[in-house]
């Protein structure tokens, strides 16, 4: 999923946004790791690899949330992931009007089989297990997980490593947050699993769970704008999680997309977008699970 091509970009991003996320991780893609030349990545050259000739078909979930998207409208080029998608499209020679958005639920995005899109951008973490069924691009964002609880909950005031094991958690099926709960927090109670993050959030509001875990930007948005009386309690230390664009297994288009991501790192575009949409997440404390 990740391979940094320019060490300078790693240094800049790592020092500027180390606490909230960067684009410095590397993971193997299941597609060819060969570098694509500028000529082979011209718009005319990649037409044969597109889902629909003449347009770039980009998938994400519905609903989508700030700061990744704004007003649940992926096509407006606002929010970090929307802006990244359009920046990649421009690198591949597409005009904004040639980017077509389609809906793909998170839970089915990494299932084996053909895809009805060129790539999916939806905070999808690279894992070796997922990479057996789909292909990931290099990283466009490295993230930390964070814990969300309601005001007045004991989670807010008592969140040492020992304390965290005693709470009832819930999360969306297949997410890094759920994996983090199980593998890192290791609570004494089995976490409750929901089909969507919205369902997990509703369970938190209804006091059917005491806390949920998700990436820091989403957690902050949920606490400040989506859920009544919720707080982002703290972040957890990085565990190597990073997001990549998702393709059908072996899609050759990933090589040119990786070329585009490398260019956006080297010219400062990704760093600028992180500072625009994600800089706020530096302020939250970090706790050990």
Walk through the language-model features, giving the residues of each.
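Bacterial lipoprotein signal-peptidase II cleavage site
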Residues: 19-30
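Ligand-binding clefts/hinges and TM-proximal coupling segments of bilobed small-molecule sensing domains
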Residues: 22, 37-48, 176-192, 232, ...
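Extracytoplasmic small-molecule ligand-binding "clamshell" domains
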Residues: 36-120
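Periplasmic-binding protein-like
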Residues: 62, 142-149, 216-262, 280-289
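Extended ligand-binding regions for polar small-molecule ligands
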Residues: 82, 91, 153, 168, ...
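Acidic, polar ligand-binding/catalytic clefts
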Residues: 97-161
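Short helix-initiation/N-cap motifs at beta->coil->alpha
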Residues: 99-111, 155-156, 192-202, 206, ...
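A ligand-binding cleft/hinge motif common to bilobed small-molecule-binding domains
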Residues: 108, 124-133, 182, 205-206, ...
